[in-house]
């Protein structure tokens, strides 16, 4: 007997405003339960300390979560100067205290160093793996393992304020950039040490900041559903963004209705204006219904890479 799927078949992207003090996986599981979704995944973890934008992909949208993981991010960070911790944030133990003694010119010079393309050695307190185990597990046991420097790109690093011993910055960066590491390295360049005391992700890809919703707001809506005998589809589903927003920066290739069945069965098809070596967003027919992503194959045809399961929306 086939195993019955649990939860609703609901597809879309929720822009969660994660609270501080919780893991990204905890937040993910809460969202999945609130929506009663059969499938859910996030698009790149935030530290428990951090707050802000955590896109949650539901249903078929999980097939495209990697593209949000690879997207640029933007953060607002406040660093406490004069103290260095073993985790580079306020969750760790203070390992060194020094006087704060630098000029605005020295700060400007230090900030300029981090702008553009650089190489960054990841923190030991990160989820990157060494021999199959996350680095933070080694760190908790007091073991330091070798890490290779990785290329990052800081597109913007804006000075916001310096009030007492607290420095606030706005950072727009590429995937894989560790803000805690930038903060720690900056503190060493300034000669006083520093660690993160506030970190908020304000943007992922081009998603709007104003569309975020918190777990508390979701819980209140679920309570409303139960109290007023409404449905989740009526109350929660309007919060979801279309799943193709995860790949909205890809060129759209529209496939006509007559060849759509061949494509949806996994067969390459002939289309016009197909770019070389680029993933494209595939839509069908005059309705331009999003069905997945594809790429030109060696024969110059559009080959599907990730296709969604088409369902009757009324059946969800």
UniProtKB/Swiss-Prot annotation:
UniProt keyword terms in alphabetical order: Isomerase, tRNA processing
EC number: 5.4.99.25
Catalytic activity, as annotated: uridine(55) in tRNA = pseudouridine(55) in tRNA
Protein's GO biological process: mRNA pseudouridine synthesis; tRNA pseudouridine synthesis
Cited Pfam families: TruB-C_2, TruB_C_2, TruB_N
InterPro entries hit by this protein: PsdUridine_synth_cat_dom_sf, PsdUridine_synth_N, PUA-like_sf, PUA_sf, tRNA_psdUridine_synth_TruB, tRNA_sdUridine_synth_fam1_C, TruB_C
Active site (record annotation): 47
GO molecular function: RNA binding; tRNA pseudouridine(55) synthase activity
Listed CDD domains: PseudoU_synth_EcTruB (cd02573), PUA_TruB_bacterial (cd21152)
Cited NCBIfam families: TruB
Task performed by this protein: Responsible for synthesis of pseudouridine from uracil-55 in the psi GC loop of transfer RNAs.
Family label: Belongs to the pseudouridine synthase TruB family. Type 1 subfamily.
Protein name (record): tRNA pseudouridine synthase B
Lineage, uppermost ranks: Bacteria, Pseudomonadati, Pseudomonadota, Gammaproteobacteria, Alteromonadales
């Amino acid at each position: 007997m086939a195993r019955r799927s649990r939860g609703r078949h609901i597809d879309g992207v929720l822009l969660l405003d994660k609270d501080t003090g919780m893991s990204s996986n905890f937040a993910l599981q809460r969202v999945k339960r609130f929506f009663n979704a059969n499938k859910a995944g996030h698009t790149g973890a935030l530290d428990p300390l951090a707050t802000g934008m955590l896109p949650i992909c539901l249903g078929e949208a999980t097939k495209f979560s990697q593209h949000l993981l690879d997207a640029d991010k933007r953060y607002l960070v406040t660093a406490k100067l004069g103290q260095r911790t073993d985790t580079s944030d306020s969750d760790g133990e203070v390992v060194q205290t020094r006087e704060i003694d630098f000029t605005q010119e020295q700060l400007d010079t230090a900030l300029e160093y981090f702008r553009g393309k650089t190489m960054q050695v990841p923190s030991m307190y990160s989820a990157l793996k060494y021999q199959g185990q996350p680095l933070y597990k080694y760190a908790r046991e007091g073991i330091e393992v070798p890490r290779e420097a990785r290329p990052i790109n800081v597109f913007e690093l804006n000075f916001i304020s310096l009030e007492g011993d607290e420095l606030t910055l706005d950072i727009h960066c590429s995937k894989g950039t560790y803000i805690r590491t930038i903060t720690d390295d900056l503190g060493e360049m300034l000669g006083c040490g520093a660690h993160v005391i506030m970190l908020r992700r304000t943007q992922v890809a081009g998603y709007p900041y104003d569309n975020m919703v918190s777990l508390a707001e979701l819980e209140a809506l679920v309570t409303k559903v139960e109290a007023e005998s409404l449905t989740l589809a009526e109350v929660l589903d309007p919060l979801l963004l279309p799943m193709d927003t995860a790949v909205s920066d890809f060129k759209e290739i529209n496939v006509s209705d007559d060849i759509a069945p061949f494509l949806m069965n996994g067969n390459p098809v002939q289309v016009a204006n197909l770019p070389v070596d680029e993933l494209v967003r595939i839509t069908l027919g005059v309705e331009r219904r999003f069905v997945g992503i594809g790429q030109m194959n060696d024969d110059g045809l559009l080959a599907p890479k990730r296709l969604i399961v088409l369902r009757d929306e009324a059946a969800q």
